[in-house]
Amino acid sequence: MALRRRPSVSDAVDRSTPLGLIDYSATAPAVEFKNVSIAFDENVVLRHLSFAIPRGDMRILLGRSGSGKSVLLKLILGLLRPDAGTVLVNGVEVGHLPERDLLEVRGDIGMVFQENALFDSLTVAENVGYRLSEQATMPVEAVRERVAAVLGFIGLAEYADRLPSELSGGQRRRVAIARAMAPEPRILLFDDPITGLDPLIATTIDNEIVKLRDLQQVTSILVTHQIRDAFYVATHRAVWHDGAVQVVSADAASLPHVEFMVLHEGRIYFQGSAAELLASPDPYIREYLLLTLPPW
């Protein structure tokens, strides 16, 4: 089953909230940092960080271990609070929100970790629909239809009744992506989702990320240490062809909404397209790429 942007079943997904913090008709960036700093004891991780991600855009976040990539994601989720500056998600400042209000903001964010724990006693379909089933306002049949649509989009429809223990590592990662996208979040955060997978399986995960970006128009941040996969995602796009989805090569001009951000010493050291990153004469960027790029 092919999943197109906002299928009819999505009308059953409850977007109403008792708090009404988020105005989805507004034009505010999906994510915005304004002069954000955070430190742990004497270790300053982020220094006066400022950037904005328009809705529907993608940022691929690179940097050496300890550069603050995962900290940045936790700030977006409100799991950490900045020492200074402002973090906004869909126009809402999350840095000082109480936990009850943060639940509304997080309800529009999907998160995929390197090791997403699945419920071993639940089937694939039950895992994917778990968060939807908790919404009392969503009919059971609508949950089933949404789960079927998501599994069809991700290419795992035939695995709906299997248990996680019956899946390969790559299939489990794809189930984690399906679970994250089931509630139709407008923002998806990927924290090293490809690490530990062999190159062929990793490419299937890359393709799912590309499909979500281009066909579902979600705003996404991809944190990865896998430079090959980062460039693959930045140089491919998903298109419909003869009723099926294809992931094809693309140049930077056709993907203006995709940019790299390289963190170094707590700051955004570089921001630009894949071509601009590869062409950068900056000594640190050259050294970083030399140490991390595979021998193509």
List the predicted regions and their residue ranges.
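Conserved catalytic motifs of ABC-family nucleotide-binding domains
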Residues: 184
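Catalytic Walker B motif of ABC-type/P-loop ATPase nucleotide-binding domains
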Residues: 188-191
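Conserved ABC ATPase "signature" region
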Residues: 92-93, 140-159
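Helix-to-loop junction immediately C-terminal to a conserved catalytic motif
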Residues: 77
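Short coil-to-helix segment of the ABC ATPase nucleotide-binding domain corresponding to the Q-loop/switch region
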Residues: 122-130
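ABC ATPase NBD coupling module
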Residues: 94-110, 134, 140-141, 277-281
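Conserved ABC ATPase signature
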Residues: 163-167, 171
